[in-house]
């Protein structure tokens, strides 16, 4: 495959070749990660992934504070021939890491079921870590590479920009699959729902029910590209339907920190205040199921049980709450399945990145 192979594998091939030729003998120290990264023009995180992979396979050993050395004897049944593309060829446990920020539990469980189902078919095991921010994301990536995992499926953290570690891994052709987000300028494997179309479907549903007094509860547009697309799609559909777009006072942006607290946070005061200031509202659209749950609880608490609520993602049941009348299904189970298929293709040497866009679906509940 030449240069089309993932660069961390090329580093592993180089190290094994030096050992096989006798250039590096048992107990010899190999070049540090920094030098290997410079030699192969890759990031240090990719060089580290290559080294740790060989340590875990018995070819190298690490000594704290000293460096990495050639092991005395390869593991049982090992040879110093070319390393396989992934650990499956050696019969070791095959692992894929899933990194996901704190999201509404129902969405998380559905996505997870799709990932597990497809990985089971492929004979892989799954390691999952829920994270709370970019710093935790970087730490988790490093920890997973140190295990090592064969591929990473990452539901990217909120924010306008990608974690630099993810960008480096993608550029170094490490098997990374992005969920819910795609890089604009760098080709990579990704799977996500058409958020703009989903936002439009929410507005069309409400207009179809004859509702005109509408509020929107969201996160700041910079929170994720998906949120920005949902808001744009929603507003565009209102205009196309002959309804003026929502003014700023009818759009509430809630701090995303509530997603990092628990699966059942307290009702934010700003939601109570928003509903109190707009007694005329007949319906509220929200950009995810967590916000729908909080709006529903607030409406129940305030006696506004006739409020029509629509959201993205299937809502989980919550007592003492006004339940949504409809939601936009992003097919999280299928998203999970596709993410795994993309990972398997990458591990099998498929070098052409794929961008898979899922069509949203409106599900009416009552």
Write out the residue ranges for each language-model feature.
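Extreme N-terminal segment that seeds HTH/winged-HTH DNA-binding domains in transcriptional regulators
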Residues: 1-39, 52, 77-84, 355
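Amphipathic helical "hinge" segments at domain boundaries
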Residues: 9-10, 78-150
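Flexible loop/turn connectors
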Residues: 14, 18, 272-366
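Periplasmic-binding protein-like
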Residues: 97, 149-157, 177, 215-218, ...
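Short beta-strand elements in bilobed, periplasmic/extracellular small-molecule ligand-binding domains
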Residues: 119-131, 235-264
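Flexible loop/hinge segments that line or gate small-molecule binding clefts
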Residues: 155-198, 290, 313-325
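Hydrophobic alpha-helical segments within soluble ligand-binding/sensing domains
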Residues: 190-216, 236, 264-272, 292, ...
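An alpha-beta-alpha
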Residues: 202-244, 352-366
């Amino acid at each position: 495959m030449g240069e089309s192979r993932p660069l961390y594998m090329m580093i592993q091939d180089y190290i094994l070749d030096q050992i096989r030729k006798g250039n590096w003998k048992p107990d010899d120290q190999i070049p540090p990660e920094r030098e290997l990264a410079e030699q192969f023009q890759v990031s240090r995180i990719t060089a580290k992934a290559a080294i740790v992979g060989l340590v875990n396979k018995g070819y190298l050993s690490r000594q704290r504070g000293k460096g990495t050395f050639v092991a005395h004897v390869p593991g049982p049944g090992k040879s110093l021939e070319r390393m396989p593309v992934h650990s499956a060829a050696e019969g070791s446990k095959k692992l894929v890491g899933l990194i996901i920020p704190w999201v509404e539990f129902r969405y998380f469980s559905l996505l997870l079921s799709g990932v597990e189902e497809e990985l089971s078919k492929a004979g892989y095991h799954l390691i999952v870590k829920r994270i709370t921010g970019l710093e935790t994301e970087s730490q988790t990536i490093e920890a997973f590479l140190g295990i090592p995992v064969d591929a990473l499926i990452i539901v990217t953290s909120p924010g306008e920009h990608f974690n630099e570690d993810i960008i480096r891994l993608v550029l170094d052709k490490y098997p990374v699959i992005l969920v819910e987000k795609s890089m604009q300028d760098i080709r990579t494997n990704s799977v996500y729902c058409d958020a703009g179309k989903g936002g439009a479907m929410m507005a069309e549903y409400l207009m179809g029910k004859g509702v005109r007094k509408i509020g929107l509860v969201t996160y700041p547009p910079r929170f994720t590209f998906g949120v920005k697309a949902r808001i744009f799609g929603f507003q565009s559909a209102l205009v196309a339907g002959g309804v003026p777009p929502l003014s700023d006072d009818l759009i509430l942006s809630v701090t995303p920190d509530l997603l990092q607290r628990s699966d059942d946070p307290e009702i934010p005061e700003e939601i109570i205040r928003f509903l109190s200031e707009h007694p005329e509202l007949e319906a509220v659209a929200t950009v995810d199921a967590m916000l729908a749950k909080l709006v529903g609880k607030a409406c129940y608490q305030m006696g506004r049980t006739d409020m029509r609520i629509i959201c993205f993602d299937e809502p989980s049941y919550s007592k003492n709450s006004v339940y949504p009348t409809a939601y936009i299904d992003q097919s999280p189970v299928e998203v999970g399945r596709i993410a795994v298929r993309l990972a398997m293709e990458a591990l099998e040497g498929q070098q052409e990145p794929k961008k898979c866009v899922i069509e949203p679906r409106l599900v009416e509940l009552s």
